[in-house]
Amino acid sequence: MTLSAPSDALVIAGKPYRSRLLTGTGKFKDLDETRLATEAAAAQIVTVAIRRVNIGQDPNAPSLLDVLPPDRYTLLPNTAGCYTAEDAVRTCRLARELLDGHNLTKLEVLGDERTLYPDVVQTLKAAEQLVADGFEVMVYTSDDPILAKRLEEIGCVAVMPLAAPIGSGLGIQNKYNLLEIIENAKVPIIVDAGVGTASDAAIAMELGCDGVLMNTAIAGARDPILMASAMRKAIEAGREAFLAGRIPRKRYASASSPVDGVIG
């Protein structure tokens, strides 16, 4: 299983997690596939779009909680589909009511339907309101290092910069900005959006990200269960490579075999 060692836990809002792979619950063909993919990913935190997924809003419809029970998983309600701070705050309050006072939430305030980029002004506004209201906010944002630091200073418990547009599968487009965010952060930095395959996830972890959240890369794969397993292994490999420390890049060769005692 892709689980960090106990001494290398991902800590969010004071709670340790062994898995650094966070998964979404949308786009799967049914709830059973959602469950199987989540298990294959060994995810402990799963995000839920409150405006799109039933977690009790409709008592007559199948509920995600039937396959991903809160006593086994940390549910991370998100505000996907919100375009204003007001809508996002209202959605978070609804989620807290449905989940019996659960305060951990993923804030998304989108700027437009074509790019699904975050509206940074509305995101800042919503983050301030939610933190003041007692929420533990994990926030989706652009890869702007200044904005990421500002969201941390507001009190967000994790900052989640995009690697590329949501659902694009383009992979990490700006390593420099991500490194700037990581090096200056005192809260977990979790790549959110844009991952397409296992190598993208590994690169994010090799850069020093604390985790990766993904949905489309798994749910949209030809074999979602197998891809979830691949992502789990990639996260583990990338994290171990980061901790091990890569060798520096050089322009010239460096022999790997010792030269002492060479014949001739």
UniProtKB/Swiss-Prot annotation:
Q: Which GO terms describe its biological process?
A: thiamine biosynthetic process; thiamine diphosphate biosynthetic process
Q: Name one GO cellular component term.
A: cytoplasm
* Enzyme Commission designation: 2.8.1.10
Catalysed reaction equations from the record: [ThiS sulfur-carrier protein]-C-terminal-Gly-aminoethanethioate + 2-iminoacetate + 1-deoxy-D-xylulose 5-phosphate = [ThiS sulfur-carrier protein]-C-terminal Gly-Gly + 2-[(2R,5Z)-2-carboxy-4-methylthiazol-5(2H)-ylidene]ethyl phosphate + 2 H2O + H(+)
Q: By its UniProt entry, which InterPro entries does this protein fall under?
A: Aldolase_TIM (IPR013785), Thiazole_synthase_ThiG (IPR033983), ThiG (IPR008867)
Q: Which CDD domains match?
A: ThiG (cd04728)
Chain positions recorded as 1-deoxy-D-xylulose 5-phosphate binding sites: 167, 193-194, 215-216
Give the GO molecular function terms: thiazole synthase activity
Record-annotated active site: 106
Tell me, what's a Pfam family for it? ThiG
Where in or outside the cell? Answer: Cytoplasm
The metabolic or biological pathway listed in the UniProt record of this protein is: Cofactor biosynthesis; thiamine diphosphate biosynthesis
Q: Which key words tag this protein in UniProt?
A: Cytoplasm, Schiff base, Thiamine biosynthesis, Transferase
Q: What does this protein do?
A: Catalyzes the rearrangement of 1-deoxy-D-xylulose 5-phosphate (DXP) to produce the thiazole phosphate moiety of thiamine. Sulfur is provided by the thiocarboxylate moiety of the carrier protein ThiS. In vitro, sulfur can be provided by H(2)S.
Which family does the UniProt entry place this protein in?
A: Belongs to the ThiG family.
Entry's PANTHER family?
Answer: THIAZOLE SYNTHASE
Q: Quaternary arrangement and interactors, per the entry?
A: Homotetramer. Forms heterodimers with either ThiH or ThiS.
Name of the protein in its database record: Thiazole synthase
Q: Lineage in the entry?
A: Bacteria, Pseudomonadati, Pseudomonadota, Gammaproteobacteria, Lysobacterales
